[in-house]
Amino acid sequence: LAGDQILPRITSNVSIMASEPTADPLREWLDSIAKFRAALTGDELILPAHGFPFTGVHARLDALAEGHHDRLDALEAALKEREMRAVDTFGILFARKVDDSVYGIATGEAMAHLRYLEYAGRATCIVRDGVAWFSA
């Protein structure tokens, strides 16, 4: 039973929550993906919380990790060009336009990516007038 951790077509929502604004959930999630990969043979039938059961978990775990690392690299490159708030990163992180129905979730996920870069020493955060601005 994979729950929301390993989904066949979409990625899990990995977000900074208001109750833990300094957390590093993306690092924790990527670490857990690596642990799953080491613990599973690759032949298991995966039962996700969303979508159909599937096999080939190693390829899926690799794709999930690579996708996040690709977005982190693109985000870092953009932060070298200009300062950004979490909401400024949506076009880099998400394939679809972020509408009002998912704005909060998207902001939390953007913050998770920004904090990951910050804690890895690949970005810095400055708070001005209550707004977190990131640069690399």
Q: At which residue positions do the language-model features occur?
A:
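Metallo-beta-lactamase
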Residues: 1-72
